[in-house]
């Protein structure tokens, strides 16, 4: 009991209170944020002034929220996209295959047509338009010979009805008719089998 106030006096435990405060402070010092501690370990090359510029720890980056990009924190880009399967590539329709078949069919038809034209030089490469022109000229030549045979050797040549085109085409047809007339008058014998085509006709056609 205290002699001053007459009340019982409880001694103050200064030593124990100081120990409790020191323990609490020590525990707070040891409880460092795990992100800051890991950041210090992973960035040893940074100087102390740069520590204040480091990004603060935010819980939203550790919750794995969707739509967040973690690539600037060392994460794998695109890791947040879940359920994304391989992209399916749609195949194009079979139009390309049909086009290749059509082209092959046309080329085969032109190759067969070139074989039907006689006296073609071996080193001569004919285009499609040249093949068609030579084929029509050869057909006109054969029809002219057949027509002259029916007319008992008359020299009048067969004239096919063509639409009028430009002056160059008309001149070519006129020259062809003149060549056919001259070749028919010089050769009176009736040929047997496949009829040949005179070489000067080839020379005239290749000049075009």
From Swiss-Prot:
GO CC terms in record: nucleus
Q: What InterPro entries does the entry give?
A: bHLH_dom, E-box_TF_Regulators, HLH_DNA-bd_sf
Question: CDD domains, alphabetically?
Answer: bHLH_TS_HAND2
Name the segments for region: Disordered: 79-106, 161-197
Molecular functions (GO terms)? DNA-binding transcription factor activity, RNA polymerase II-specific; protein dimerization activity; RNA polymerase II transcription regulatory region sequence-specific DNA binding
Q: Which GO terms describe its biological process?
A: cardiac muscle cell differentiation; cardioblast differentiation; cardiocyte differentiation; cardiogenic plate morphogenesis; determination of intestine left/right asymmetry; embryonic heart tube formation; embryonic pectoral fin morphogenesis; embryonic viscerocranium morphogenesis
Please provide the record's keywords in A-Z order. Developmental protein, DNA-binding, Nucleus, Transcription, Transcription regulation
Task: Using the UniProt record, give the first listed, main subcellular location.
Answer: nucleus
- Localization terms from the record: Nucleus
UniProt domain bHLH: residue ranges: 90-142
A single Pfam family, by name? HLH
Q: Compositional bias of type Basic residues: which residue ranges?
A: 88-103
Q: Where is the composition biased (Basic and acidic residues)?
A: 161-178
Asked if the Swiss-Prot or TrEMBL record annotates the protein with the keyword Cell membrane, the reply is no
Describe, as the record does, how this protein assembles with itself and its partners: Efficient DNA binding requires dimerization with another bHLH protein.
Identify this protein by name: Heart- and neural crest derivatives-expressed protein 2
User: What species does this protein belong to?
Assistant: Danio rerio (Zebrafish)
Upper lineage is: Eukaryota, Metazoa, Chordata, Craniata, Vertebrata
Query: What gene is this protein a product of?
Result: hand2
């Amino acid at each position: 009991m205290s002699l001053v106030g007459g009340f019982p006096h409880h001694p103050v435990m200064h030593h124990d209170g100081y120990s409790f405060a020191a323990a609490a402070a020590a525990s707070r010092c040891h409880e460092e944020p795990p992100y800051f501690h890991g950041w210090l370990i992973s960035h040893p090359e940074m100087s102390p002034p740069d520590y204040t510029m480091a990004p603060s720890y935010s819980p939203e980056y550790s919750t794995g929220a969707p739509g967040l990009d973690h690539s600037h924190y060392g994460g794998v880009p695109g890791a947040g996209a879940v359920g994304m399967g391989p992209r399916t590539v749609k195949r194009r329709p079979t139009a390309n295959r049909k086009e290749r078949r059509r082209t092959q069919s046309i080329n085969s038809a032109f190759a067969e047509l070139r074989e039907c034209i006689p006296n073609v030089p071996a080193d001569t490469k004919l285009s499609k338009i040249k093949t068609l022109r030579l084929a029509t000229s050869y057909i006109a030549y054969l029809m002219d010979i057949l027509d002259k045979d029916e007319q008992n050797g008359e020299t009048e040549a067969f004239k096919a009805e063509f639409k009028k085109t430009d002056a160059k085409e008309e001149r070519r047809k006129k020259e062809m008719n003149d060549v056919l007339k001259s070749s028919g008058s010089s050769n009176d014998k009736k040929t047997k089998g496949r009829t040949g085509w005179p070489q000067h006709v080839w020379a005239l056609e290749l000049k075009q």
